[in-house]
């Protein structure tokens, strides 16, 4: 088999994965707090037929040698944690982090997951939960007689009750940050898990020590740019077509050899 067939096959596979990444970004263009991915390419091993710098004669050496590439692969996907635009809403339970940090969400097994999606609701006990019913950590429980619900930029949660105009603090939000957010593991439902690559979470008060502030009646939009993704999609399509063309050309060359030799 011509080596070009294998090389082109790796190109098709890599561009297919790249297109899948782009399509996932576009599919989540309206997902609150979504962070786009970028596929990272890496060339495969080379066949060293003539070593660069090897002696060609007693008094001369090869300036470049002969190195034949064997293709390409997707080595990873890089999560881009640049902030999305902020959208004002009329829901007091909607929150966003303006700057670095993640909301902490308690999983059913007791582990902590992390999210930039601040779309919260109240469950039957008055506890702040995600759309899937997972509790915010630290737990915030809103009394049934609460008339107003306020979240400060420092994460202080306060309410007022009927017949009492005095503000009552019922809890404090704490956010988490990571040395390498791109190393977090995506598990769906807008949630991430800590990994060895992300490092241990640094938990703190919003607005202090580099943590972003919390904004009420606000949601963070996806950071996907449709224009940028469409340009990437066209580039990927062209690369896929060119690799397909190489396979067609190599096939024609093989047919010529079998028919004429």
Question: Which functions belong to the PLM regions below?
Answer:
Residues 1-261:
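Amphipathic alpha-helical polymerization modules
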């Amino acid at each position: 088999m011509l080596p070009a067939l294998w090389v082109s096959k790796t190109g098709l596979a890599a561009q297919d994965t790249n297109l899948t990444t782009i399509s996932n970004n576009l599919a989540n263009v309206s997902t609150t707090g979504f962070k786009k991915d970028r596929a990272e390419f890496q060339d495969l091993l080379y066949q060293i037929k003539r070593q660069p710098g090897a002696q060609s004669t007693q008094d001369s050496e090869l300036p470049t040698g002969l190195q034949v590439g064997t293709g390409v692969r997707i080595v990873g996907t890089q999560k881009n944690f640049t902030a999305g635009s902020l959208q004002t809403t009329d829901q007091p339970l909607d929150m966003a982090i303006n700057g670095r940090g993640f909301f902490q969400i308690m999983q059913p097994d007791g582990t902590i997951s992390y999210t930039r999606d601040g779309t919260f609701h109240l469950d039957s006990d008055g506890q702040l939960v995600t759309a899937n019913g997972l509790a915010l950590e630290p737990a915030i429980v809103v009394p049934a007689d609460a008339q107003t619900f306020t979240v400060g930029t420092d994460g202080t949660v306060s309410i007022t009750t009927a017949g009492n105009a005095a503000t009552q603090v019922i809890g404090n939000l704490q956010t988490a940050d990571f040395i390498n957010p791109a190393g977090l593991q995506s598990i769906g439902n807008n949630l991430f898990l800590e990994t060895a690559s992300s490092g241990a979470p640094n938990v703190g008060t919003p607005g202090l020590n580099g943590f972003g502030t919390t904004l009420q009646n606000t949601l963070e939009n996806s950071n996907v740019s449709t224009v940028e993704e469409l340009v990437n999609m066209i580039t990927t399509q062209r690369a896929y077509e060119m690799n397909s063309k190489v396979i067609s050309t190599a096939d024609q060359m093989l047919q010529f050899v079998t028919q004429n030799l």
